[in-house]
Amino acid sequence: TGDAAARDAVLRAADLICRTFLDTGRRVREAGSTEMNMAVIHILARLYRDTGRERYLQMARVIEKDWEAEGDYARQGAGNVDFYRQPKPRWESLHDIQGLLELYRITGEEKYKTALVHIWRSIARFDRHNTGGFSTFEQAIGNPYIPGAIETCCTIAWMAMSVYMLKLTGDARVADELELSLLNSVVGMHAASGRWATYNTPMDGVRRASAHDIVFQSREGAPELNCCSVNSARGFGLLGDWALMRDAEGVVLNAYGPGVIRTVLDTGAALTLTQTTDYPRGGRVELAVAPARALTFTLKLRIPRWSRHTRV
């Protein structure tokens, strides 16, 4: 959005983290709940890329070193250890793992890319449920068919990590996973009225407002305010990160559905894509491509892996 106030808030939070830990010699791991508290690594590394402030990278490097005694994500992932077998298989670790992409972008070291790709694939294979939801009782267990709570926040974290994976690899199978999660889990975790979201959206069972399951989080006057109710809508918001993306050759349309997408090509020309369709209910998508001026560019269309007969 270009909201300067929002950016300033993030920078001030990052500066506070640096003053609290980097300037004092204290370690983030000493705060406990390390998979949660160390998740700031991906924000710090991204802020370093955006601002060039060396303190942010230094803080990220300290956290990376402390990973070795906690989640050990980089070494475990690069060593092809599946996520559910790693030391910290809770869902919050996925935000730590997003830091692997940021470190790869900063350093170019393949070990970070290798680790992220392996961890993502192991989750997709062993812990992504048939609904597109992730986790069983808030963590990876290596079996997606065991019934257990599939928490809203866990699925949103899986989708956020998948966006990073898609940006890294451009692999259309990742977009397939995002579509599966969006159209099943994210839609399913919301009441039709929009008033509440679930804590648990099961493969088979009953959907209940999150307030029934995690009432301990409630605040006076706001019984339905909790982590899941404020996080669930992000599943829809993430669509803006992966529906249309760029690669070295042009633009890639990953998501289908009625609507209009506007972007700017590398040439500086504006581009409008309009979809007329009732996808996924129907299989026909009419796409109107309208650049602001006549020009040649590459437009790639994702072919869903479930499609058996596709024509363009």
Give the role of each language-model region.
Residues T1-V312:
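Glycan-recognition and catalytic cores of secretory/periplasmic carbohydrate-active enzymes
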